[in-house]
Amino acid sequence: MASLKSIKKRIVSVKNTRQITKAMKMVSAAKLRRAQENVVAARPYAQKMGEVLQSLAGNLEGNLHPLLEKRDAKKLLLIVVTSDRGLCGGFNTNLCKAGERYIKEKQAEFDQISIMTVGRKGYEFLKSRHTVYKNFANMLSKPNYQAAAMLAQDVIEGYLAEEYDQVVMLFNSFRTVMSQDITFQQLLPIEPEEKIAADENGVEYIYEPSVSDLLTEILPKNIEVQIFKAMLESVAGEHGARMTAMDSASKNASEMIGKLTLQYNRARQAAITTELMEIISGAESIKG
């Protein structure tokens, strides 16, 4: 049986750990509230941006915009969005494993598959298994639109230079505090809907200066918005996953403290009983 001193030391150690996990849970809860607000605000904007883009693309006549033009898809770029920090359960691991399955499925379809990671954990997981084309770290601690615009510009330039023919983004969509949805979203090429003659109310729009000019502005902006939304979704999911993981860790620590305390009390009782028996035996031997 372990000594009283070692058991007491373990109890103190677990209590200190529980203090840390409780603090991390509270911090994640506070950050989650802000992250949720950002996601709720970004979703309608991203959705409306997509609707406007589809309307414009559906009414485009003549030559397609380069970002709408379909070509033989031989080179794929997969953008994997994970967190920079750990201690959030299977948040990053599950996503990266889904990415690996996707890569395996697409190997027969594409001659070349490049990987771009956003977040340190995705890079660390994938670099030992695949060649990571580019890595963007420290963008998600405080996600901002400028960072998303920079990433979008990099992606668009590579696509126009035909470094890849298709771009897919993989990220965790925030659903609830305890769950996230692994999401694959095709960024490029953008597939327009069929030509739209009029909206639901029978109104036909006239675009000024022209559909082509508007698309030149809105297509890159849409890529920026979709990447920024994915970053916000990932951050909210990360804080939710970390809060859940730290809550579970705190509960496990409390259970362990209870078991160790019981073990400590039993060991202490056994030590006292042994000591009493020795005293009684000593007294009996003196009498004898």
From Swiss-Prot:
One Gene Ontology molecular-function label: proton-transporting ATP synthase activity, rotational mechanism
SUPFAM superfamilies: ATP synthase (F1-ATPase), gamma subunit
Membrane topology: Peripheral membrane protein
Cystines in this chain: none
Location(s) in or outside the cell: Cell inner membrane
PANTHER family reported in the protein's UniProt record: ATP SYNTHASE GAMMA CHAIN (PTHR11693), ATP SYNTHASE SUBUNIT GAMMA, MITOCHONDRIAL (PTHR11693:SF22)
InterPro entries with a match to the protein in the record: ATP_synth_F1_ATPase_gsu (IPR035968), ATP_synth_F1_gsu (IPR000131), ATP_synth_F1_gsu_CS (IPR023632)
Listed transmembrane segments: none
Source species of the chain: Trichlorobacter lovleyi (strain ATCC BAA-1151 / DSM 17278 / SZ) (Geobacter lovleyi)
GO cellular component terms listed in the entry, alphabetical order: plasma membrane; proton-transporting ATP synthase complex
Gene3D superfamilies, sorted: 3.40.1380.10, ATP synthase, gamma subunit, helix hairpin domain (1.10.287.80)
Keyword line: ATP synthesis, Cell inner membrane, Cell membrane, CF(1), Hydrogen ion transport, Ion transport, Membrane, Transport
Pfam families reported for this sequence: ATP-synt
Subunit structure: F-type ATPases have 2 components, CF(1) - the catalytic core - and CF(0) - the membrane proton channel. CF(1) has five subunits: alpha(3), beta(3), gamma(1), delta(1), epsilon(1). CF(0) has three main subunits: a, b and c.
Name recorded for this polypeptide: ATP synthase gamma chain
GO biological process, one term: proton motive force-driven plasma membrane ATP synthesis
UniProt family annotation: Belongs to the ATPase gamma chain family.
PROSITE patterns: ATPASE_GAMMA
Function according to Swiss-Prot or TrEMBL: Produces ATP from ADP in the presence of a proton gradient across the membrane. The gamma chain is believed to be important in regulating ATPase activity and the flow of protons through the CF(0) complex.
